[in-house]
């Protein structure tokens, strides 16, 4: 397996809290690990259910579902704890990657130098345990490395989420992202407008991220919504995405500027569920990535709250929609962590 799932530690915690039945929640990339963990726990006399819905991140814990099916605890794989109220004790397992970050950096040192001498280093939960080692290596190569602390939605300095890039709001000429895919580095580039180099520790490949093409597409969405009179404003019931006050603000703003607007409550936000409504455009006040990454599947224009402000002439510069928190009191431990009901 490519990721660390500390089965014995998880079992120890479950025994400590007296859990007899658990629900395991995992993203699609960790389904095999979830099944393997289930087998191990059942061998140790713990009843296990697997959560089959798509998981979008730490913002979407299945604690409510765990409680409904009589589970004593939830095991959440692949993400770290986000400060949210929980209905059952929940074990967060970051699933650290078993791959060397430094080896990938060594392979791409020439590209990293193009960022400049003062760089900001970021990563995801899967590689966060190697961030200190990465920083030391880069400093030995002559770089001045900044790692931002981030806010209360972040577990560790340097960690990015798809909706939160607070760790990158520090001084630096460019940003180095350590991780796979362009999901996070694209968000970094749009949120900070800095040069972003992504290095994949699994393949050792690099990618330079250009946000301008992406931003042009967003301006096109705003233009398409310019003549819309009826707006559906979507709010999510996922705990870490629930922004009801912001959604109500957007409804009020649209009405103030002569548009019709109605609030729509959803769990998973996608256009197919909205086909029968007569709205001419939508505003997603839930996961900020839905209108940005999935807009091609929408037959109507779909905007973020900040894009609505541009539409109404209240904002000129394009700004990435983030879900930000307050100051973080302490970091999470490196490894599993358990958080109880509140």
UniProtKB/Swiss-Prot annotation:
Effect of residue 287 to A: Still able to bind a 4Fe-4S cluster. Less active than wild-type. Not able to bind a 4Fe-4S cluster and loss of catalytic activity
Name recorded for this polypeptide: 2-(3-amino-3-carboxypropyl)histidine synthase
Involved pathway(s): Protein modification; peptidyl-diphthamide biosynthesis
Residues holding [4Fe-4S] cluster: 59, 163, 287
Subunit structure: Homodimer.
Reported function: Catalyzes the first step of diphthamide biosynthesis, i.e. the transfer of the 3-amino-3-carboxypropyl group from S-adenosyl-L-methionine (SAM) to the C2 position of the imidazole ring of the target histidine residue in translation elongation factor 2 (EF-2).
Cofactor: how and how many bound: Binds 1 [4Fe-4S] cluster per subunit. The cluster is coordinated with 3 cysteines and an exchangeable S-adenosyl-L-methionine.
Enzyme class label: transferase
Organism listed in the record: Pyrococcus horikoshii (strain ATCC 700860 / DSM 12428 / JCM 9974 / NBRC 100139 / OT-3)
One GO MF term attached to the UniProt entry: transferase activity, transferring alkyl or aryl (other than methyl) groups
Comment field (misc): Unlike the enzymes in the radical SAM superfamily, Dph2 does not form the canonical 5'-deoxyadenosyl radical. Instead, it breaks the C(gamma)-S bond of SAM and generates a 3-amino-3-carboxypropyl radical intermediate. Thus, the P.horikoshii Dph2 represents a previously unknown, SAM-dependent, [4Fe-4S]-containing enzyme that catalyzes unprecedented chemistry. Moreover, the chemistry requires only one [4Fe-4S] cluster to be present in the Dph2 dimer, although each monomer can bind a [4Fe-4S] cluster. In contrast to eukaryotes that require four gene products (DPH1, DPH2, DPH3 and DPH4) to catalyze the first step of diphthamide biosynthesis, no other protein than Dph2 is required in P.horikoshii.
Keywords assigned by UniProt, alphabetized: 4Fe-4S, Iron, Iron-sulfur, Metal-binding, S-adenosyl-L-methionine, Transferase
EC identifiers of the protein: 2.5.1.108
């Amino acid at each position: 397996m490519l990721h660390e799932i500390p089965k014995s530690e998880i079992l120890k915690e479950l025994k400590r809290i007296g859990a007899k039945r658990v629900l395991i929640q995992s993203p699609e990339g960790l389904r095999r690990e979830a099944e393997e963990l289930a087998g191990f726990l059942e061998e140790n006399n713990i009843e296990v259910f697997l959560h089959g819905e798509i998981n979008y991140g730490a913002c979407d814990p299945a604690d409510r579902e765990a409680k409904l099916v009589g589970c004593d605890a939830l095991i959440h794989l692949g993400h770290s704890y986000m400060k949210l109220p929980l209905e059952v004790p929940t074990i967060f397992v970051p699933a650290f990657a078993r791959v060397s970050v430094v080896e990938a950096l060594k392979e791409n040192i020439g590209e990293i130098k193009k960022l400049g001498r003062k760089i900001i280093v970021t990563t995801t939960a899967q590689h966060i345990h190697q961030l200190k080692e990465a920083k030391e290596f880069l400093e030995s190569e002559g770089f001045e490395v900044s790692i931002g602390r981030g806010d209360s939605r972040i577990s560790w300095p340097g960690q990015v989420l798809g909706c939160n890039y607070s760790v990158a709001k520090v001084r630096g000429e460019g940003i180095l992202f350590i991780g796979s895919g362009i999901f996070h580095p694209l968000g970094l580039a749009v949120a900070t407008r800095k040069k972003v180099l992504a290095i994949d520790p699994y393949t050792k490949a690099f990618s330079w991220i250009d946000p301008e093409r992406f931003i042009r597409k967003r301006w096109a969405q705003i233009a398409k919504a310019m003549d819309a009179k009826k707006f559906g404003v979507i709010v999510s019931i996922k705990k870490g995405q629930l922004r009801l006050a912001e959604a109500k603000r957007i409804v009020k703003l649209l009405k103030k500027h002569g548009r019709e607007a109605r609030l729509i409550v959803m769990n998973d936000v996608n256009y197919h569920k909205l086909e029968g409504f007569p709205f001419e455009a939508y505003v997603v006040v839930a996961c900020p990535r839905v209108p940005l990454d999935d807009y091609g599947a929408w037959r109507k224009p779909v905007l973020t709250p900040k894009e609505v402000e541009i539409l109404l002439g209240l904002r000129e510069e394009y700004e990435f929609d983030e879900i930000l928190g307050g100051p973080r009191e302490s970091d999470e431990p490196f490894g599993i962590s358990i958080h109880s009901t509140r």
